[in-house]
Regions:
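Basic- and hydrophobic-enriched, low-structure N-terminal and domain-boundary segments
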Residues: 1-93, 97-105, 110-112, 469, ...
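P-loop NTPase motor domains
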Residues: 70-72, 76-408, 423, 493-498, ...
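Short, conserved catalytic or adaptor-binding loops enriched in Gly and charged residues
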Residues: 132-134, 330-332, 429-434, 622-625
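Short linear proline/tyrosine/threonine-rich motifs used for host-factor recruitment
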Residues: 186, 604-606, 620-622
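Conserved ATP-driven motor cores of ASCE-family P-loop NTPases powering translocation/secretion/packaging/pilus
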Residues: 400-402, 406-503
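Residue-level detector of alpha-helical secondary structure
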Residues: 568-579, 583-587, 591, 621, ...
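Short edge beta-strands and adjacent turn/loop segments
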Residues: 588-602
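Intrinsically disordered, low-complexity regulatory segments enriched in Ser/Thr/Pro
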Residues: 613-644
Length: 650
């Protein structure tokens, strides 16, 4: 081979090497901004170890959300800074075995004890972790609607009753002292407890009657809420007067009382009872506008009320909520694990979950506010599985915004973003998301996969193209390198992930790691606490209904040819005031006074000896309570008849 030919081949080889390897490197260096179309990436191991707290699983000091595990799963890095987390996993994604049970395991074994509230639809978490928690010093409680005979008890009205009893106690002290300074002190304390009981009543009624964001006209739910507030207040007033026992103040008893109002006779009786109460009484002030509604409107309100309260007809629910055997704020005073076990095949029970969450949260806020630092002595994690299957938690925006500062951390488990939107609406859902980190486990829907892909963001990648032509005596070639955007993970890639977890903390880039199942964690111990059997009771005797009310019967000088029913006797008591007014004006001009009945309403017919004088007629009209009574004057021969009717009782 001649030297010129060898030289040509060497030159061509150098050009090819240059074009294929060296020029792309030069072009890459020349690119001005390799983040031009996006800078998304996953955190590096170095960044994870720098940003999060490392703990030895054999000696855990303080628990956060597990972000990363060492290969041998002897060490874990916790996120202790992100206030709350949303766990996104469709049905069958392994939320319990990869997220809930590991979290409970860490809490049980940590030196710094935190209480834990767990919604546990299948009872799976209780079965797998309760003994481990107990062995590590935890108080174990269950509210078990699957097995009510094994459940603890929680009277939903207990906090309200306790507050009202303090009001009664200090009111009695006020009446029994002549010391002016003590009177001021007792008066202020009494009224503060009364105000707090009213606040708790309003809060509970709001929790129970809360409607989804795209629900009915708010008028109906607000009216049903007022009905519940009024009935709770009525029960407390009856308790104060000694007419009912403490054990009769339950949600089921209130439900039965309202049911007993469904027939016309009992409804009228209750209206008369309200008429007798003084204005300023909580029950009267709340119920008066409702009982004065027209019949159709009132029936619609009671329809909403009955729909929301129907759950308390359930015998299991009635037994569990008939009394309380623990204090709601115990979770903020002593390391406690409370499991809420509900039949997940019947979503109506999730209403009770929302109610219990709201009650305990309110009690823990009160407890935290008593501390100088406004924080719980024993902090708490809320592990809320099937969160978006529950009716909305009232004022959830405030909960996620301020609960961290009080020592409360929430873990919300949902199946999709759409599920959250359906319960809270897009605006409130976004507030929840803005206050939470996100842990992605698995999805079956493309919409959710697209949302996760979008949240991960885009990265900038290179795109190279080469065109070349080689001839015997010449070479023509061209290579170009450009930048373009690509999703860090496409929706299809997100959807196809298997046993992988993506975590979006508030600090740093997203984290991509293998999913760890609880039985791989060396500090986990299997075991279930044996619970005491509590036989169910027939609670019929504890219900307070209108039929069971004992009305006061007073003597009267009026004559009657009829044997008046208890209801008519109550009407008679109200009519007596008007009769006395007329008697004081007409004195000895009355011949007789009789009770009559018209359209099942009692009225009084007063027969005078003579015709009533115009002057006396004017005086009677001026003195009689025209808001309560309606007068009719008629003449028959030389005598006058006065009819005294009750107006609408409420």
């Amino acid at each position: 081979m001649s030297s010129p030919l060898i030289f040509v081949l060497i030159v061509i080889s150098i050009l090819i090497i240059f074009l294929k390897y060296i020029e792309p490197m030069i072009n890459k260096y020349k690119l001005k901004n390799d983040n031009e179309y996006g800078s998304a990436r996953f955190s590096t191991i170095y960044e994870i170890k720098r940003n999060f707290k490392k703990e030895n699983l054999s000696n855990i000091k303080r628990v956060g959300v597990p972000i990363y595990y060492s290969k041998n799963i002897k060490y874990v890095w916790f996120d202790t800074e992100t206030p709350h987390y949303i766990y996104l996993g469709s049905s069958g994604s392994g939320k319990s075995v990869t997220a809930v049970i590991p979290m409970v395991t860490f809490l049980a074994n940590a030196k710094e004890k935190r209480s834990v509230f767990i919604t546990d639809p299948k009872g799976e978490i209780f079965h797998n972790t309760s003994k481990m928690l107990k062995d590590n010093g935890y108080n174990i409680l269950t509210i078990d609607f699957r097995n009510p005979c094994l459940s603890n008890h929680i009277n939903i009205l207990e906090s309200i009753i306790c507050e009202y009893e303090k009001y009664i106690e200090y009111e009695k002290l006020l009446k029994n002292t002549n010391d002016k300074e003590k009177q001021k002190e007792y008066n202020n304390i009494s009224l503060s407890h009364y105000a707090e009981s009213n606040r708790l009543i309003s809060s509970l009624a709001e929790i129970i009657m809360q409607e989804k964001v795209e629900g009915k006209d708010p008028f109906w739910n607000n009216s049903a809420r007022n009905l519940l507030e009024g009935l709770i207040s009525f029960f407390l007033e009856e308790y104060k007067e000694g007419k009912i026992k403490r054990e009769q103040i339950t949600m089921t008893s209130i439900r039965k009382f309202q049911t007993s109002m469904m027939n016309d006779k009992n409804e009228r009786k209750f209206k008369i009872l309200m008429e007798q109460k003084p204005y300023g009484t909580k029950s009267k002030d709340t119920l008066t506008p409702l009982l004065s509604m027209n019949e159709n409107t009132y029936k619609s309100v009671t329809g909403v009320f009955n729909e929301k309260m129907a759950i308390f007809d359930d015998i299991n629910v009635a037994n569990i909520t008939a009394q309380s055997d623990f204090e709601l704020n115990i979770l903020g005073r002593k390391p406690t694990a409370l499991f809420i076990i509900v039949p997940d095949e019947d979503k109506v029970y999730y209403t009770l979950v929302t109610i219990i969450i709201g009650l305990i949260y309110k009690e823990l806020v009160k407890l935290a506010n008593k501390n100088t630092v406004k924080k719980l002595d024993i902090e708490i994690d809320w592990l809320l599985d099937e969160f978006a299957n529950c009716p909305p938690i009232a004022d959830i925006e405030s909960v996620v915004s301020v609960s961290r500062s009080r020592g409360m951390r929430f873990h919300f488990f949902i199946q999709s973003f759409a599920q959250l939107d359906n319960v809270y609406g897009k605006e409130v859902s976004q507030i929840i998301l803005d206050n939470c980190g996100l842990i992605y486990l698995k999805t079956n829907t493309m919409d959710t996969a697209e949302a996760v892909s979008k949240r991960l963001g885009k990265q900038t990648i290179e795109s190279s193209s080469i065109s070349q032509s080689i001839q015997t005596i010449s070479y023509n070639g061209n290579q170009s390198t450009s930048l373009m955007a690509r999703e860090l993970l496409t929706p299809d890639e997100v959807k196809s992930l298997h046993y992988k977890t993506i975590i979006f903390p508030n600090v740093g880039y997203p984290i991509f790691r293998d999913t760890v199942i609880f039985n791989k964690i060396n500090c986990y111990k299997l075991g279930e606490v044996i619970r005491e059997i509590r036989p169910l009771k027939n609670l019929t005797s504890t219900y307070y209904t209108i039929d069971a009310m004992n009305s006061k019967k007073e003597n009267s000088s009026l004559t009657s040819n009829n044997d008046f029913s208890e209801f008519q006797q109550m009407e008679k008591q109200i009519l007596q005031e008007g009769i006395d007014t007329i008697k004081n004006i007409l004195h000895n001009k009355i011949e007789k006074i009789e009770y009559k009945e018209l359209n099942m309403r009692t009225y009084v017919l007063i027969t005078l000896k003579d015709k009533v004088e115009t002057k006396n007629k004017s005086i009677i009209k001026g003195k009689i309570n025209n808001k309560k009574y309606h007068l009719e004057f008629n003449n028959i021969g030389n005598k006058s008849l006065i009819e005294l009717h009750l107006k609408s009782l409420i």
